[in-house]
Amino acid sequence: MASRVLSSIIPHNCCITLHQYSRLLPYESIARNLSTRDKAVIRQQTLDRFLRVDHAGEYGADRIYAGQAAVLGADLSTEEKRHTHKLVNHMWEQEKEHLRTFEKLIPEYQARPTALLPLWHAAGYILGAGSALVGGSRGAMAITVAVEACITEHYNDQIRVLIDQNSSENSNEELIKLITKIRDEEQEHHDTGLEEEAEKWWLYEPVTVIVKSGCKAAIWLSERI
């Protein structure tokens, strides 16, 4: 029913997909044509997609910091290196907590984890270790800035949708609070990376473009697979 209602309000000659249109159209303008059951179906589909990609993102972040910590921890000969290693471990601990949160939410909301976790397991570690090997402290921080900028924007988009779909019948309040808290910590990681002179790394600009594009592709894939 939900899909039929959406299909009926999309022009037949429209070049955008049903999924794209449903994201552009204000939820309340759709909801007034739907039954309580259909609203619940849309909400469940939204949460399934959101939690799958959020779990995948935090899993990847955990692996990035694992790779960085392993490389940076191999040489603690200077105060600067010890400082960076401590900082990376602090952010890693927060990412571990984020991952634990989504590992609990996945079964709670009956969401399906992405099938791409083995890929993100390897890719995240390689990205983290590689950035620290090639760029040291600034290289590691550059990756943090790029990834967290993308993730923060992603969480902001999700929060807007969850607020839009919030209702007395289907409350998203607790989930909004959780994602907002995680979003704020990701923003702190981004800002910390800038404070640690990520932008002074000579590869900062090209790496930022590549990593942000990779993150967006990973989000797109994890939502669907």
What does each model-found stretch correspond to?
Residues 2-225:
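Non-heme di-metal
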